[in-house]
Amino acid sequence: MNTEILGVILQWVALVVLCYPLGRYIAKVYRGERTWLDFMAPLERGIYKVCSIDPDEDMDWKKFLKALLMVNLFWFFWGMVLLCCQSWLPLNPDGNANQTPDLAFYTCISFMVNCNLQHYSGETGLTYFTQLFVIMLFQFITAACGMAAMAGIMKALAAKTTKAIGNFWVYLVKSTTRILMPLSLLVGILLVINGTPMSFDGKQTITTLEGQEQVISQGPTAAIVPIKQLGTNGGGYFGVNSSHPLENPNAFTNMLECWSILIIPMAMAWAFGFYVRRRKLAAWIFGVMLFAFTAGIFVSVPQEMGGNPNIDEMGIAQDLGSMEGKEIRIGSAASAMWGMVTTVTSNGSVNSMHDSQTPLSGMMQMLNMQINCWFGGVGVGWMNYFAFLIIAVFISGLMVGRTPEFLGHKVEAREMKIATMVVLMHPFLILVGTGISAAVAAANPEIGWLNNPSFHGLSEMLYEYTSAAANNGSGFEGLSDNTPFWNIMTGIALIMGRYFPIVGQVAIAGLLASKKFVPESAGTLKTDTFTFSLMTFAVIIIVAALSFFPAQALGPIADYLSF
């Protein structure tokens, strides 16, 4: 147990220490300053030339968003065609079949919005070709889109008065060539060294120690897992995700993959500070996020290490903690840590079965996604926090009788309305979707969605919509979700949960940047203080967390009390 706790502490320290220099590097990339990866410039110029992109063009926020949405729409149709035709394409040594249109529709949406909620198993639901040219491609594109959107917001907030927020295409390309690809290459090499396969051979039949034959799936796993983690995507190469011994072979790869999930979202908080020259503000934002993340660890890890009280009553020793749904080579503490990391971001990959974790751990995982701004997805997580910042600035300004301003830009009714709609859309999608599904399940029990009725069954449905709306992708897998109903309902939540906030937040930044710059004065509300950070935290808890309390009370809290 002491070794497991030490592993959790080391992961936390490695994240906190290394995210700062990475954030400084990311800010330099988006500012166009010299970096050690400038040798990628010829490749980038080649991409601009082939795609007829003018890298010197400055876009306003409307043109910026149009480019972002169009590139996502194009690749959606690309993925649909390939998934529906994958059995006839090359690199299919196992003869896997085409996906059905509704499953292909759902898969493309899920991966296009950085969610990666999977209603299929990778070994049988995809071919090597579609793993590489749909899944891995989407994982790079969607992560780069989120980072590009944040880069545009940073440029808008750093400027005094401007209508230009940068070039989406340049941010998209640089996010890929100078941040995601180099880190993915490094992580991929370390995974191969530790036993993760990188092959295009088909399934192999082996004889186990018990003398039984077993079919082992393999493939280009080491190429896909790094961007799965670094891009906060989370879609597993194998059906059981990072619980699989070939996707996550040992304790070192477990720590590496867990670190990879959170390092860029953490770094983006610092990148904002370096970009706008407000490191103190970035430190307070980072501190609020880190406090919430660490608090979740202090709840979840002891819960999982403490074991299941029902098993205690049976007189069975639980020296290893609550091990239901967990891998022996990983352990209860590392599984709980991963659960917090994967839900505090929009990653959603798993190294254990979240459905089998104790009720309070499951509640914390849901709460992380329901709040949806503690680090979050690459780029998009900070943007969600930005919406709460705008609300906190507006409320604080009214409370103390000062004009609401953020970084020299007045926050007025229009920005406040957009921020409010962005913040309220998240609970609307989750609670309305869960309510409809609960009503359908109660009226038609023969459909067999729920393997666990009562409180835990409601928790499973609540978790599914929470994961979809937060673009997370993890799930309480006791729910039978590969049906047209769930594919369509959660597909709607995926689209709205991804694009509505991005459009709103980029619009807010563009509107703020176009206003006359107001220099700081004695009457300016300070946003880089403990008091304002506490105010922002309170706004997040009141507006986001408490919106879900009734649903949490009927689901995981009731589940815990009946444990």
Predicted regions and their residues:
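Membrane-proximal intracellular helices of multi-pass ion channels
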Residues: 1-563
